Curated annotation (Swiss-Prot):
Oligomeric form and interacting partners: Interacts with OPG148. Component of the Uracil-DNA glycosylase(UDG)-OPG148-polymerase complex; OPG148 and OPG116/UDG form a heterodimeric processivity factor that associates with OPG071 to form the processive polymerase holoenzyme.
InterPro entries, per database record: DNA-dir_DNA_pol_B, DNA-dir_DNA_pol_B_CS, DNA-dir_DNA_pol_B_exonuc, DNA-dir_DNA_pol_B_multi_dom, DNA-dir_DNA_pol_B_vir_insert, DNA/RNA_pol_sf, DNA_pol_palm_dom_sf, DNA_pol_type-B
Molecular function GO terms recorded: DNA binding; DNA-directed DNA polymerase activity; hydrolase activity; nucleotide binding
UniProt keyword Hydrolase, yes or no: yes
Function: Catalyzes DNA synthesis. Acquires processivity by associating with a heterodimeric processivity factor comprised of the viral OPG148 and OPG116 proteins, thereby forming the DNA polymerase holoenzyme. Displays 3'- to 5' exonuclease activity. Might participate in viral DNA recombination. Does not perform OPG116/D4synthesis across an abasic site.
GO biological process, one term: DNA recombination
Pfam families, A to Z: DNA_pol_B, DNA_pol_B_3, DNA_pol_B_exo1, DNAP_B_exo_N
Gene from which the chain derives: OPG071
Listed name of the protein: DNA polymerase
Catalytic activity as recorded in UniProt: DNA(n) + a 2'-deoxyribonucleoside 5'-triphosphate = DNA(n+1) + diphosphate
Description of what induces expression: Expressed in the early phase of the viral replicative cycle.
Species the sequence originates in: Variola virus
């Protein structure tokens, strides 16, 4: 029997079992049950002394045990690391057992199962039937997995089954209550093993009149009275809420491969199961494949107060306890962990994922027609957009949300007519968000037409789950994660990096016959992070070349062989004499390149020097682990370059990014005290070497010159750690034209990247030169495994401060005719605590600054005068006209209790609001507020006690005739940011004092 593993899961009853859900070549699903064991590693001496004897034991052969406690010394008399070799045994017990002096107890039992039996969690195997005992149709017991799964075979494709769902609930306040608010709609996207896709929505008929129900039937809806009458081929079905819930129960109890929701673990599934129990007393029940254990659907929470989220709220995750092999997958939780976005609402995520450049085909009266295909955007983007458009009801054109009037869709493109104001450009960016509807108002005016409209919105949200599933390549990532982390598919995204790293670490330790032990308590000290340079100026009219180190920290660990067992010791000094003696003797006793000595900042205030010494002769555990991850990343990057469609590119890009993150997380885990990889000296040495590498690159580029086909680097090309046999001559021949004459200046750097200004505004030449620079740096400047990559040309760069800048980005693969991407790194445009007015204005002024830099007709003083003069005109005009709507000035904040002071004004504001309003603001909820003052208050220069002007803005709020927006608060914040973009501090201070009666705060460089 040939099978492919698709999921592993446990039953937690009186008799614990491990189950495999697998699929045969013919699409048949087969479950295999295994005994569940707890695993212990002991020496032969302990094994022989155990009473009673172990349930099962396997010899592991001779293994080397290394004590990885850090040795701290004030001189070079460092004792050798304790190391011993002994015969070891792996013990399997069906129940937990207290065994003294067992080692390797930090690893997961499931990882031991896979590795000890030679099984890959996502592998394909030809099973030996003699080791299988049939339990029932489709379920077998296996007591000897090692022999049963001995024959691994090449991977083969199998079909998968899915259920994507969404619900809508009636509510009369801000959030539905399971006790009083019925479910109005449930929508499903059902894909079976044959690939057949069914879309259907159940509508609660109890919220409609009998006349409306009859009209719905006349319009083609199916009306059913019981579960037995359900026809899944029909798109719209009317039924009572009880029948609606019974159908949900039936579907959720089926053994799909995946049941996918968006925030369903926290809301949809919880609401369905609670509502079902409330109305019928029934529960959703899952049964194990052997039919011997039944569990009720239950959502349980994990609260990790050690991982605080925004506003001090504990990081809470939600999990479904099922035992039937289905993976309940919450896209909301997954995207939060894997993507860094401004917002994790479904509309924001969809807008980020599904966009396409569309060409204007026709302009009508308040409507426009767009066409999209492979000629209007990158290959595949229009096809993905068209797929989402099949259920989409609204399309966003730039920032304008437009209703779909008509749509034509074909294989690789679309034509769509939108209700839209007349726009003048020929092409626009079209994107998808969640349908732009006011559900509260729709329920208030609820009737048949609204119910049918909501059905369309609900099924679109269910389908969005499918589209996002495919966009993020979740299935590919799940299988790759299971293989890489040595974890079940259902657990790949459950754990943090400190846990997922344990599987590959255990595998490596067993391959190298190594056991790492500690006898001392782990100590935690602070240490310096990556190097961030201060920006050398604010605005750049010349182009800036961006060079990034490839996986800097992982490659630092590989270069220095940084690992707890390769650390020879740490030499510290408390006075200058000690330091001088140690420095003189150090290189004699520990000569490079076998050893590397890393100067770090002292761990304690009474020390003046600290040097870590690593042995590079035998590759350590951490470098070996990193090589595996980097090799996988390189494989997916190669596949990314060869991919032809945007979908393939998105999946391979996300896969290489996954391996990048896990490789980079190893550095973080070295400094995390609860990690199996914890090594304070290694983590500290990693950042120290990283800082020296970025300083080295900056030193050779800052002041470099190109002329007559020769590049003269600014300094000799000397290895900053030890002398080697490389040519250090800074003059290098290039393949560039001999008439090129350019100078280079390093203007900024951040951890693993260097920003280098070239005295040119020509994008094509800048890219050409940067690519040659990349080649020369990698071949002549850098050494060992260090490499850099030319990332982009930044045009019209505006540096606000460290880690804050705005620019137009031309990627390495583009040219001067390409459309540049606007980048806002760490600026107000990307923050949620900034008003739309502020964002709009700062965007206008940054664009204006960018244009001034491009034209190059003004010096920095003239630019400053022009910008400040224009800003004053705009602010005075807005203050006098008061024409902008209140929504442009609204801010949002999360309500929480994590305040140092009990009488915090934010807490007082919400408490007073809740006293006087039926729709109270709950903990963890975001609320909107604005600064409001009396209408007769003149322009206020000196702003005091501005917290007292905060007013919560809800749906019922209307700005009274005796009130106005307290514009000065917003103007001052906007002006503070703009003056930080300008170079002339004297003019900025004078302007700010005249407008607001105080000096501005300038960002620290």
């Amino acid at each position: 029997m040939d099978v492919r593993c698709i999921n592993w899961f446990e039953s937690h009853g009186e008799n614990r079992f491990l189950y495999l859900k697998s699929r045969c070549r013919n699409g048949e699903t087969v479950f295999i049950r295994f005994p569940h064991y707890f695993y212990y590693v002991v020496t032969d001496e302990i094994y022989q002394s155990l009473a009673p004897p172990p349930f099962n034991a396997r010899p592991m052969g001779k293994m080397r045990t290394i004590d990885i406690d850090e040795t701290i010394s004030y001189n070079l008399d460092i004792k050798d690391r304790k190391c011993s070799v002994a015969d070891m045994w792996l013990i399997e017990e069906p129940k937990k057992r207290n065994i003294q002096n067992a080692t390797m107890d930090e690893f997961l039992n499931i990882s031991w199962f896979y590795i000890s039996n030679g099984i890959s969690p996502d592998g394909c195997y030809s099973l030996d039937d003699q080791y299988l005992t049939k339990i029932n149709n489709g379920c077998y017991h296996c007591g000897d997995p090692r022999n049963c799964f001995a024959k691994e075979i090449p991977r083969f494709d199998i079909p998968r089954s899915y259920l994507f769902l969404d619900i809508e609930c009636h509510f009369d306040k801000k959030f539905p209550s399971v006790f009083i608010n019925p479910i109005s709609h449930t929508s499903y996207c059902y894909i079976d093993l044959s690939g057949k896709r069914l879309l259907f929505t159940l509508i609660n008929e109890e919220m409609l009149t009998e006349q409306e129900i009859q009209e719905a039937v006349d319009r083609g809806c199916l009306r059913i009275q019981s579960l037995m009458e359900m026809d899944y081929e029909r798109e719209l079905v009317l039924c009572s809420e009880i029948v609606l819930l019974q159908i949900a129960k039936q579907l959720l109890e089926l053994t799909f491969d995946y049941i996918v929701t968006f925030n369903g673990h926290n809301f949809d599934l919880r609401y369905i199961t609670n509502r079902l129990e409330l109305l019928t007393g029934e529960k959703i029940i899952f049964r194990s494949p052997d039919k011997k254990e039944a569990v009720h659907l239950c959502i349980y929470e994990r609260n990790q107060s050690s991982h605080k989220g925004v506003g001090g709220m504990a990081n809470t995750t939600f999990h479904v306890n099922n035992n039937n092999g289905t993976i309940f997958f919450d896209l909301y939780s997954f995207i939060q962990k894997s993507e860094k976005l401004d917002s994790y609402k479904l509309d924001s995520i969809s807008k980020n994922a599904f966009s396409c450049m569309g060409k204007v085909l026709n302009r009508g009266v308040r409507e426009m027609t767009f066409i999209g295909d492979d000629t209007t955007d990158a290959k595949g983007k229009a096809a993905v957009f068209a797929k989402v458009l099949t259920t989409g009801n609204y399309v966003t054109v730039d920032d304008i949300i437009c209703k779909v009037i008509h749509k034509d869709i074909w294989e690789n493109g679309f034509k769509v007519v939108l209700s839209c104001p007349t726009l003048t450009n020929d092409t626009y960016k079209l994107s998808f968000g969640k349908d732009d509807v006011d559900l509260a108002q729709m329920y208030k005016d609820y009737n048949l037409n609204i119910a049918l409209d909501m059905a369309r919105y609900c099924i679109h949200d269910a389908c969005l789950c499918q589209y996002l599933w495919e966009y993020y390549g979740v299935e590919t990532k799940t299988d790759a994660g299971a293989s890489t982390y040595v974890l079940p598919q259902s657990m790949v995204f459950e754990y943090k990096a400190s846990t997922v790293i344990k599987g590959p670490l255990l595998k490596l330790l067993l391959e190298t016959k190594t056991i790492l032990v500690r006898s001392e308590t782990k100590q935690k000290f602070p240490y310096e992070g990556g190097k961030v340079f201060a920006p050398k100026q604010k605005m750049f009219s010349n182009n800036v070349l961006i060079f990034d180190y490839n996986s800097l920290y992982p490659n630092v660990c590989i270069f220095g062989n940084l690992s707890p067992e390769t650390l020879v010791g740490v030499v510290v000094s408390s006075n200058r004499l000690e330091e001088e003696i140690n420095n003189q003797l150090l290189l004699q006793k520990y000569p490079p390149p076998r050893y590397i000595t890393v100067h770090c900042e002292p761990r304690l205030p009474n020390l003046i020097s600290e040097i870590a010494i690593f042995d590079r002769s035998i590759e350590g555990t951490i470098p070996r682990l990193l090589r595996t991850f980097l090799a996988e990343r390189a494989r997916y990057k190669k596949m990314l370059k060869q991919a032809t469609s945007s979908t393939e590119k998105a999946i391979y890009d996300s896969m290489q990014y996954t391996y990048k993150i896990i490789a980079n997380s190893v550095y973080g885990l070295m400094g995390f005290r609860n990690s199996a990889l914890y090594s304070y000296a290694s983590a500290k040495s990693c950042t120290s070497i990283g800082r020296r590498m970025i300083l080295y690159l900056e030193s050779v580029l800052n002041g470099a010159e190109l002329s007559n086909g020769m590049l003269r680097f600014a300094n000799p090309l000397s290895n900053p750690f030890y002398m080697d046999d490389r040519d250090i001559n800074p003059i290098v021949k290039t393949s560039l034209p001999i008439d090129y004459r350019f100078r280079f200046r390093s203007v900024y750097g951040d951890t693993d990247s260097v920003f280098t200004e070239i005295d040119s505004q020509d994008v094509d030449k800048s890219i050409e030169i940067a690519k040659e620079l990349e080649r020369l740096i990698n071949s002549r400047v850098l050494f060992n495994n260090f490499k850099i990559e030319f990332e982009a040309v930044y045009k019209n760069l505006i540096m606000q401060s460290k880690k804050k800048y705005t620019t137009m980005k031309y990627s390495a693969s583009s040219n001067s005719k390409s459309v540049p991407e606007r980048i806002n790194k760490g600026t107000s445009e990307t923050r949620r605590d900034v008003s739309k007015f502020h964002k709009n204005m700062i965007k206008i002024y940054k664009t204006r600054l960018s244009e001034m830099l491009s034209e190059g007709r003004m010096n920095s003083n003239q630019v400053c005068i022009d910008i400040l003069r224009s800003l004053e005109t705009d602010l005075r005009s807005e203050f006098d006209s008061r024409s902008s709507p209140l929504e442009l000035f609204m801010l949002s904040r999360m309500h929480h209790l994590n305040y140092k002071s009990a009488d915090n004004p934010n807490m007082y504001l919400v408490t007073e609001y809740n006293k006087n309003n039926p729709e109270t603001i709950e903990l963890g909820e975001r609320y909107y507020f604005a600064y409001i003052c009396p209408a007769n208050v003149p322009w206020t220069k000196k702003l005091v006690n501005i917290k007292t002007y905060e007013t919560i803005i809800d749906r019922s709020f209307k700005l009274g005739s005796d009130q106005r927006i307290f514009y000065e608060v917003y103007f001052k914040r906007l002006t503070s940011e703009i003056v930080n973009l300008l170079d002339n501090k004297v003019l900025c201070i004078s302007f700010f004092e005249r407008m607001f009666g105080s000096r501005p705060t300038f960002y620290e460089a």
